[in-house]
C-alpha cells in the first residue's frame, strides 16, 4: 500500500513537471505558472521520498512501478491546468485517507501518525489554494480572456513567492 502511494506521489510530480514546462514554452510564456507547477512537482517528489525513507526505516521493501504518462501534453490554459491539478490533489488526498484507514484497521499507529503529521494538513491547504486559483481565474474570465491568465500569472502567482 505504501508502494502504491509512492507511485501516486511520483505520478503527481511528473504531471506537475509536464505542466511547468508547458507554461515555460515560448508560445505560452507564463513564467509564474511554470514556477508554481515546478515547485509543486518538487513537493510531490519529496512526499514520495519521505515515504520511501519510512518504508526502509520500518524494514519494508520498496517496489517501484512504471510511472504513468500525464493525461495531456498540451495543458491548453492556466485554468485547465489548475482544474487538473485540483483533481489530482483530491485523488492524492483520497489515496492518503485510504492508506490511513488501512493503517487504522491494521492497528499501525506509527503510520497513522506519519500520514497525519506529514501529509493530511498539507493536502487540505493545497486543495484550498488550487480551488481559490480556479475560482479567481474563472471570475477574471479565463480561459476566454488571455489577459486574465496573464494578469493572474503576474499579480497572483508572481507575488506568491513573497508570501511563502
Curated annotation (Swiss-Prot):
SUPFAM superfamilies: Ferritin-like. Residues 1-141 form the Ferritin-like diiron domain. One of its GO terms (biological process) is intracellular iron ion homeostasis. Fe cation 1 binds at residues 9, 44, 47. One of its GO terms (cellular component) is cytoplasmic vesicle. It catalyses: 4 Fe(2+) + O2 + 4 H(+) = 4 Fe(3+) + 2 H2O. It holds the Pfam family Ferritin. Belongs to the ferritin family. This is Ferritin heavy chain. It comes from Oryctolagus cuniculus (Rabbit). The gene is FTH1.
